[in-house]
Amino acid sequence: MDDCIAAISSATGEAGIGIVRMTGEGCADVLDSVFKRANDKADFINRKMTYGHIVDDNEIVDEVLVCYMKAPHTYTREDVVEIYTHGGVVAVRKVLEVLLNNGARLAEAGEFTKRAFLNGRIDLSQAEAIIDMIKAKTDKAYSVSMKQLEGSVNRNIKQLRDKLLDMLSHVEYSINFTEDMQDELDNTPVLNEGKEVLDKLKKLSESANRGRIIRDGINTTIIGKPNVGKSSLLNALLKENRAIVTDIPGTTRDVIEEYIDLDGISLKINDTAGIRDTEDIVEKIGVEKSVSFISDSDLIIAIFDSSREFDDEDRKILDLIRDKKSIVLLNKIDLDGEFDVDENLEGIEVIHTSIKNNEGIEDLENKIIEMFNDGYIEANNDNIITNIRHRDIINKAIKSLESSLHDMEAGVPIDCFEVDLRNAWEILGEITGETVDDDVLNKIFSDFCIGK
């Protein structure tokens, strides 16, 4: 995998500039064949901008700046060329077409970063950190991704694998050179070190849920009957009109997703269809989807209308959020009240709101911060797992190590518990990419955009 590839690296749409990137063997030759310098200098200077034009059959395609970066000190550790074009859709597309017509191949999704991994510039956890940085919705998520790109996950896993390797060395030495294993072998040092590794693995695994929240946001679902103010709440939190607000019940028929940064905490908010009994097929599907979102939510905001009497549909909503992490809003307090709070919401903490008048919104925001800042993992914590793939691998390693330590304590023959010990060591290598198969690699890099 060293042929010349090319792709658009800048975002699609109107912009000041566009970027087309190439890497691989022969990319300088491809550039030479389509680039006409403004002066007569023959060679590109490493890491220096060169002004000129991209041409196709001597016809100018675009006025550009070109930067040629010579291997190995590049993103991919191969020769890299970046062409800075005028912004917009057409200019970058036409420049890319010229490159493809003159020897470059269109890059696959994530192929630039995949080459950086295969060429040893980054490990797999760092490659995954790059896509997390690109997708980060808050400063905190970005900071965690940056630490992982700098190698925080790699350092943690390498330290644990090194300890497991020391244990394996001790065990294998005993297998090969101890004549009477049962009488002479002392497993105590190996057992103690194994317990230390196990404890650290469990702490990493336990960090994954809060790490996921930092990375993906608090999965928050707004529920309630039609016209209680769900879409108005979304707009109030966003501080813009994203959702349609009308007096017509059932206006929201599908789930609207938006991200909000709340004092460094990211909320992924799902504005759902109003929950009620309905004969409308489309609305009914929306209601069913609303209910299904509840089970996967980290937080549920249930809204009730203080101007209406409590009814069976309200009771159904209360039942849905029972034993869930939730906040109850009693909205429309600016209207005459029909809702008996003491009778129907006894023992439930309620925030009184008039979303239309922006009353109670700050109280809601403060409540969310209070709920999720309690023991919240800070972005400068290196001992944090944000990737679900990493968590699953760590959990598999925990099972293997627990099995090995159990057999060790039970006096099982040494060559038996060595198998699970080695398995734990190999499993952890999947995080950094040292023991991962091609299918996993292809899946990870397919999540990247083309051009990264």
Swiss-Prot record:
Record-level Gene Ontology MF annotations: GTP binding; GTPase activity; metal ion binding
UniProt binding sites for Mg(2+): S231, T252
Protein's cellular compartments: Cytoplasm
Classification via CDD domains: trmE, TrmE_N
Chain ranges of the TrmE-type G domain: 217-373
Gene Ontology BP terms: tRNA methylation; tRNA wobble uridine modification
GO cellular component terms given for this protein: cytosol
Primary location class: cytoplasm
Positions contributing to K(+) binding: N227, T246, I248, T251
InterPro entries hit by this protein: G_TrmE, GTP-bd, GTP-bd_TrmE_N, GTPase_MnmE, MnmE_dom2, MnmE_helical, P-loop_NTPase, Small_GTP-bd
Binding site for (6S)-5-formyl-5,6,7,8-tetrahydrofolate: R21, E82, R121, K452
Keyword Transferase (UniProt): no
Superkingdom of origin: Bacteria
Main EC class the enzyme belongs to: hydrolase
Entry's family note: Belongs to the TRAFAC class TrmE-Era-EngA-EngB-Septin-like GTPase superfamily. TrmE GTPase family.
Function recorded in the entry: Exhibits a very high intrinsic GTPase hydrolysis rate. Involved in the addition of a carboxymethylaminomethyl (cmnm) group at the wobble position (U34) of certain tRNAs, forming tRNA-cmnm(5)s(2)U34.
Known partners and oligomeric status: Homodimer. Heterotetramer of two MnmE and two MnmG subunits.
PANTHER family hit by this protein: TRNA MODIFICATION GTPASE GTPBP3, TRNA MODIFICATION GTPASE GTPBP3, MITOCHONDRIAL
Full protein name: tRNA modification GTPase MnmE
Organism: Finegoldia magna (strain ATCC 29328 / DSM 20472 / WAL 2508)
